[in-house]
């Protein structure tokens, strides 16, 4: 493949072509799913009386105490409601909210049984959408891996999501949708925005 242009631009294109781009959106997506599960299980609560119409179960635990963790969750929920774009700047902001939510310290083995049961049921139903169709990753492994707070260094070749940002609500909704009412599935979003259902290249 041949590219012409300024050296800096060519270098950026080659990085995109090889997947040598940090996928900030992927971390924001995974942490968003984790916060969605934490809220659905009542581990985190909003600091205001909020009803999240696309998925009432997310705020069914009701209003919680005013704490740094719940304040961060409430702010994250606002971005979910607004369908914030997962560009690099927004992803860094969402990661900061995830850190403030204290989820990093809430490892699986320390969660109450009822919380784990709720998270397991929700995760199992959407594992194929959230972790890949062929994934058999146990929810405890997935949860603790996110708590380790490791940012992926590379992504797939020609990952268009690093160029044309996707949306937080779309990614939480998953490829097949069904989580957030009134929000497009990732399949519909990808085909409309990128013209393909898998907006990445393959080696």
Role assignments for model-derived ranges:
Residues 2-203:
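Long, contiguous binding/interaction regions
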């Amino acid at each position: 493949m041949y590219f012409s242009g300024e050296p800096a631009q060519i270098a950026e294109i080659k990085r995109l072509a090889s997947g040598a781009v940090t996928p900030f959106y992927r971390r924001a997506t995974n942490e968003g799913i984790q916060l969605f599960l934490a809220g659905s299980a009542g581990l985190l609560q909003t600091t205001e009386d909020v009803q999240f119409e696309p998925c009432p179960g997310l705020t069914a635990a009701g209003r919680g105490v005013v704490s740094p963790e719940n304040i961060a969750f409430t702010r994250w929920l606002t971005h979910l409601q607004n369908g914030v774009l997962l560009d690099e700047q927004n992803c860094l902001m969402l990661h900061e909210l995830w850190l403030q939510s204290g989820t990093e310290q809430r490892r699986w083995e320390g969660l109450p049984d009822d919380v784990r049961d709720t998270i397991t049921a929700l995760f199992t139903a959407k594992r194929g959408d959230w972790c890949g169709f062929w994934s058999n990753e146990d929810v405890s492994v997935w949860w603790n891996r996110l708590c380790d707070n490791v940012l992926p260094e590379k992504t797939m070749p020609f990952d268009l999501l690093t160029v044309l940002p996707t949306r937080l609500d779309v990614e939480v909704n998953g490829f097949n949708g069904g989580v957030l009412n009134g929000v497009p599935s990732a399949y519909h979003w990808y085909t409309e925005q990128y013209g393909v259902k898998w907006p990445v290249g393959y080696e």
